[in-house]
Amino acid sequence: MKRLLLPLLAAITLPTFEPAFSSLPIVFIKDCYDGDTCTTINGEKIRLACIDAPELKGRKADPILAKEARNFVNKLVANQEVSIKRITNDRYGRTIGELFKNELNIQEIIVEKGYGKVYKKYANQCEWSKQ
């Protein structure tokens, strides 16, 4: 009985890590337009899920902060392979997804470092932003 109970107890109490990084696809990020939009070498445009960063253009633009955010994100992921968790596509045809590098959530890092904020309207799409 103990032989059956111990593995079951371990399975129930061990934390589950979402996502399973080894099963996520890998993409090569060419560059990032701003703090929440990147492009792969294949031309896929990725809108980083669950965050909002300052805009370069438009009514609510803050070009100085937007360039700082863009530079930070480019240092993190440009010209590098990252894992991607694709969630959906937006009305502009961009992939909405989470990026991971060395099993670290890029969006979470952007928010922690102050280059973006949790996009409350879509925060339910990402486990880390629900907390």
Model-derived regions: residue spans:
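Small beta-barrel nucleic-acid-binding modules, primarily SNase/OB-fold domains
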Residues: K2-Q131
